[in-house]
C-alpha cells in the first residue's frame, strides 16, 4: 500500500458523481436515491469477506457527504477535489480568494509591481523606514511640538525625582466617592445632599 501512488487532486469535479453513478447536473433527490442503493449494495455488514466493498462503501459515503452539502458541492463543481482541499486548509470562505491569487494574471501583476518598485524596496523604504530612515520625513506643522527621543535612563531619573517631590507633600484630602449619578463634566458642581435635606 505504501508503494501506491497518492491520488492526485482533480480540478474537473466529476469523479464523485461517477462514484455514485450520476452525471454532474443530478438533483439532491437523485444523489440520495443513488447513495441508498449503492450503500445497501456495498455495506460492510452485507459483504464481510470482501475488503474492496468496505473501500467502495467509504468512497460512497465520502461522495454523499460532499454532494449533499450545498457549499461543498458548489466548491467541488467549480474547482474539483483541489477546491475541497483548499477549503479544508484555508476555510470555505477563502477558496475563491485562493484561486484568484494563484491565477496567472495575479502572479504576473505581483511580479510587475515588484519590478516597478525595485523588488518592493521603494515600498519598504517609504513605509517601514519612514522615507530613508527619517531624513525625508515630512515636517511637523507650525505650532506643534516635535516629538523627541527620551532615553530610558532619563525617563527613570524623571520618575524618581517625581516620586521624591510627591513624598515631600502629604495628601490631606480624601477623594470623593463616585456613584452612577456622579457628574462627569467639570461644569456642574457635585451635590452631596440627599433629597431629604433640600
Curated annotation (Swiss-Prot):
InterPro entries named in the record: DnaJ_C_subfamily_member5, DnaJ_domain, DnaJ_domain_CS, J_dom_sf
Post-translational modification remark: Ser-10 phosphorylation induces an order-to-disorder transition triggering the interaction with Lys-58. This conformational switch modulates DNAJC5's cellular functions by reducing binding to syntaxin and synaptogamin without altering HSC70 interactions.
Chain positions found as Phosphoserine: 8, 10, 12, 15, 151
Bilayer topology term: Lipid-anchor
Modified residues (N6-acetyllysine): 56
Keyword vocabulary terms for this entry: Acetylation, Cell membrane, Chaperone, Cytoplasm, Cytoplasmic vesicle, Lipoprotein, Membrane, Palmitate, Phosphoprotein
Sequence motif Required for binding to Hsc70, location on chain: 43-45
Functional description taken from the UniProt entry: Acts as a general chaperone in regulated exocytosis. Acts as a co-chaperone for the SNARE protein SNAP-25. Involved in the calcium-mediated control of a late stage of exocytosis. May have an important role in presynaptic function. May be involved in calcium-dependent neurotransmitter release at nerve endings.
Record text on subunit structure and interactions: Homodimer. Interacts with the chaperone complex consisting of HSC70 and SGTA. Interacts with ZDHHC13 (via ANK repeats). Interacts with ZDHHC17 (via ANK repeats). Interacts with HSC70. Interacts with SYT1, SYT5 and SYT7, and with SYT9, forming a complex with SNAP25.
Name of the protein described by the UniProt record: DnaJ homolog subfamily C member 5
Protein source organism: Bos taurus (Bovine)
Species classification: Eukaryota, Metazoa, Chordata, Craniata, Vertebrata
Gene: DNAJC5
Amino acid at each position: 500500500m505504501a508503494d501506491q501512488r497518492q491520488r492526485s487532486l482533480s480540478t474537473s469535479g466529476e469523479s464523485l458523481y461517477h462514484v455514485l453513478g450520476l452525471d454532474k447536473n443530478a438533483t439532491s433527490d437523485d444523489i440520495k436515491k443513488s447513495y441508498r442503493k449503492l450503500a445497501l449494495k456495498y455495506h460492510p455488514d452485507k459483504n464481510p469477506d470482501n475488503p474492496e466493498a468496505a473501500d467502495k462503501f467509504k468512497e460512497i459515503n465520502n461522495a454523499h457527504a460532499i454532494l449533499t452539502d450545498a457549499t461543498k458541492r458548489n466548491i467541488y463543481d467549480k474547482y474539483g477535489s483541489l477546491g475541497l482541499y483548499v477549503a479544508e486548509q484555508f476555510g470555505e470562505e477563502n477558496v475563491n480568494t485562493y484561486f484568484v491569487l494563484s491565477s496567472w494574471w495575479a502572479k504576473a501583476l505581483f511580479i510587475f509591481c515588484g519590478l516597478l518598485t525595485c523588488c518592493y524596496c521603494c515600498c519598504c523604504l517609504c513605509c517601514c523606514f519612514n522615507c530613508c530612515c527619517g531624513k525625508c520625513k515630512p515636517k511637523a506643522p507650525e505650532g506643534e511640538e516635535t516629538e523627541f527621543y527620551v532615553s530610558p535612563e532619563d525617563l527613570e531619573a524623571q520618575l524618581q525625582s517625581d516620586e521624591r517631590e510627591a513624598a515631600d507633600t502629604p495628601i490631606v484630602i480624601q477623594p470623593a466617592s463616585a456613584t452612577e449619578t456622579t457628574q462627569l463634566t467639570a461644569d456642574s458642581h457635585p451635590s452631596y445632599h440627599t433629597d431629604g435635606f433640600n
